[in-house]
Amino acid sequence: MANKKIRIRLKAYEHRTLDTAAEKIVETATRTGATVAGPVPLPTERSLYTIIRATHKYKDSREQFEMRTHKRLIDIINPTQKTVDALMKLDLPSGVNVEIKL
């Protein structure tokens, strides 16, 4: 291939599904003969939401909700056409966002 590296960035709310998706990608890339660097765990993004429990008053009574976004980075070095075709046909679990840069 003309490009020397494919960078795959994965995002998910559950780290177990994210790790299984990363494992599938690494296994597919190594099976087709490419060199893989990763998965590298990136910092977890944490969103915190504070909501008043009561509808009209009692501002001191609040509830907090948290949403965590886990991220992984995988680099595929020297991919072949066979590697790209296998990655296009790969079935990943739902709930995993995949960003690919060539």
From Swiss-Prot:
GO terms under biological process: translation
Alphabetic keyword roster: Ribonucleoprotein, Ribosomal protein
Domain of life: Bacteria
Disulfide bridge map: none
A cellular component annotation (GO) from this entry: ribonucleoprotein complex
GO molecular function: structural constituent of ribosome; tRNA binding
Subunit structure: Part of the 30S ribosomal subunit.
Family recorded in the similarity comment: Belongs to the universal ribosomal protein uS10 family.
Its job: Involved in the binding of tRNA to the ribosomes.
The protein's name: Small ribosomal subunit protein uS10
Protein's organism: Streptococcus thermophilus (strain ATCC BAA-250 / LMG 18311)
Higher taxonomy: Bacteria, Bacillati, Bacillota, Bacilli, Lactobacillales
Gene that produces this protein: rpsJ
